Each structure stands twice: as C-alpha cells, then as structure tokens.
C-alpha cells in the first residue's frame, strides 16, 4: 500500500527520516542551473527532483538526480506491505538541499529520450564483437534528443522552464 509522506505516523516518519539521512542524502548532489552552470544532461528514464528557486529577484532552476542504487520505495515497519515512495521522501526534504533559496515549485521529473537507432547503420563491419557494438549503440541512445517529459506534481512555471530547456512542446509532457 502506497502511503503519502504527509500521512505517515510519527514513528514511521522517524524511520523514513533516518533512512533518508543515512542512505539517500549522502548520495545526492544538488545542481543550480545558471549562466556558469549549464543545463545538465538528464539520463533516459532516470528520476530527478526539480525545483524552481528564488534568491531575491533572481530565479534559478535546481535539479537533484536520484542515483540508481537508491531503492524506489521504503518499507514501513509495523505495517505489512505499506511503503512510501522515495521521490515523495525526496520532495519532502528538497528545501533542505537548496538552503539559501526559496523553493517556489517542485516536482519529480523523468525524461524519455529518442530510442530510434538503426542497428545496421551503427554496426562497424570490421568489428564483429556484437556485445561491444550493442554497448556502443546503447551509449549513443543515451545522448539522443528528449522526446517526452514526465512530471509528478503541479508546477506550471517549472514545467514551462523545463520544456524550454529540453526543447519540447507542451504536447510532449505528461503531468
């Protein structure tokens, strides 16, 4: 049973908070996007927490990647089958990652990249190592253009900014 973070009981909240501090927080790196820090490459189908940040009269975009080693859910003790989603926990703690900024909007996002590669065109006829060729093909796919933005949460200004940065249309985003 998926339990929203807001509905956790005190003991469960303490369990999740400890798990976050000990397991997840040390793995996170918050990135502030500005003229000296360009928009990062977002991996295909990887979860990110994104935030629209304000410092005085300046707005910035903040992004935190969720490493693959972080489990997607946290089981809750004392409630068999009950869990909270990792992205829900991350959004709850996001303000602490961007301490000097005011978080105006936040959402969990995922980008889907184009996967349209031609096997025949990508194969080097001189290199017959199929595994190496497939690995090369998969690395190329990671760098292809985004075709979809998925967002969990209502954040219209953040959505607009992300669509602009990813060069996507509103029809290519799903909330």
Regions found by a protein language model. Give the residues of each.
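N-terminal non-catalytic structural scaffold regions of very large proteins
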Residues: 1-175
């Amino acid at each position: 049973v998926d339990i929203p973070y807001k509905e956790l009981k005190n003991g469960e909240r303490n369990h999740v908070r400890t798990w976050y501090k000990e397991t997840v927080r040390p793995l996170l790196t918050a990135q502030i996007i500005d003229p000296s820090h360009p928009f990062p490459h977002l991996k295909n189908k990887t979860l990110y927490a994104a935030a629209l940040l304000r410092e005085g009269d300046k707005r910035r975009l903040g992004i935190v990647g969720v490493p693959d080693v972080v489990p997607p859910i946290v089981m809750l003790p004392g409630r068999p089958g009950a869990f909270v989603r990792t992205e829900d926990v991350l959004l709850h703690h996001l303000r602490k990652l961007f301490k000097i900024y005011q978080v105006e909007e936040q959402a969990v996002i995922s980008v889907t990249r184009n996967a349209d590669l031609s096997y025949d065109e990508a194969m080097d006829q001189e290199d017959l190592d199929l595994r190496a060729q497939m690995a090369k093909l998969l690395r190329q796919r990671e760098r292809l253009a985004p075709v979809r933005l998925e967002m969990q949460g209502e954040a219209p200004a953040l959505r607009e900014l992300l669509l602009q940065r990813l060069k996507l249309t509103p029809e290519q985003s799903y909330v």
